[in-house]
Design a protein with these regions (language model features):
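Enzymes that bind and transform nitrogen-containing heteroaromatic metabolites
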Residues: 1-153
Length: 153
């Protein structure tokens, strides 16, 4: 429910074509009726790359190319807050381009992994602790059994 509130507060939601192919998300806002009445519009749906024709999501915008150009285009459409829900490749692209104002991460008391498990960012890791990106935690909240961390640069 918390993530759907974040969606509702956003002007647009972005995922990559890989997420569309693997998860087939609808990218809709699903809130209880009383909360839904306060937020009567759905965010624009943005897909980096091309969504398959049979995908559940019906993107308002499909984009391939420079992320800065995409943000300019979305700004011209009135998008002031973009929620990036992409997988590791999209997350890395936005992070490396310095286009993230705030990270919202959920930590659950559950573990999974393995040699082929996807990490938060695609690509090679940092060679040493000196190469780590360090953000600043601006909020921590308990959401059911999980924790939500808000981190800024």
């Amino acid at each position: 429910l918390d993530a759907h509130r974040l969606r509702a507060d956003s002007d647009a939601i972005l995922v990559g074509a890989g997420t569309v192919r693997s998860d087939d998300p609808s990218l809709t806002v699903r809130l209880p009726g009383d909360e839904r009445d306060e937020r009567d519009t759905e965010p624009l749906r943005v897909v980096l790359g091309a969504a398959p024709a049979d995908a559940a999501v019906r993107p308002c915008v499909e984009h391939s190319g420079d992320l800065g150009d995409l943000l300019d285009d979305l700004g011209a459409r009135g998008v002031l807050q973009l929620m990036v829900e992409g997988g590791p490749t999209v997350a890395r692209s936005f992070h490396e381009a310095g286009l993230v104002d705030r990270y919202v991460l959920y930590v659950a008391p559950a573990f999974f992994g393995g040699d082929d498990a996807a990490g938060m960012f695609a690509g090679p890791g940092v060679p040493s602790i000196d190469g780590l990106w360090r953000g600043r935690i601006v909020d921590v909240a308990r959401v059911g059994d999980d924790l939500r961390l808000e981190i800024e640069d």
